[in-house]
């Protein structure tokens, strides 16, 4: 099974996260299939959250399950907005 999750990188006391598509059997910071975005929790830049919405929707359409944190970030990026309108 494939999941969409966050993978930590950056330095000590300065976390940054990649939003990645990975196999559920991989470690949090292990190898991933595709990087679809990034997140800066300290909001040090104007683009503190960036997600490739098209690729995120693709992976969701083929069955990737987002983790709770990834789901929250994808929702903030607007990944679920268009899907809700199309289904209505």
From Swiss-Prot:
One GO MF term attached to the UniProt entry: structural constituent of ribosome
Keywords assigned by UniProt, alphabetized: Ribonucleoprotein, Ribosomal protein
Family, similarity comment: Belongs to the bacterial ribosomal protein bS16 family.
GO cellular component: cytoplasm; small ribosomal subunit
GO biological process: translation
Organism taxonomic ancestry: Bacteria, Thermotogati, Deinococcota, Deinococci, Thermales
Gene expressing this chain: rpsP
Protein origin, superkingdom: Bacteria
HAMAP family assigned to the protein according to its UniProt record, in alphabetical order: Ribosomal_bS16
Protein's name in the database: Small ribosomal subunit protein bS16
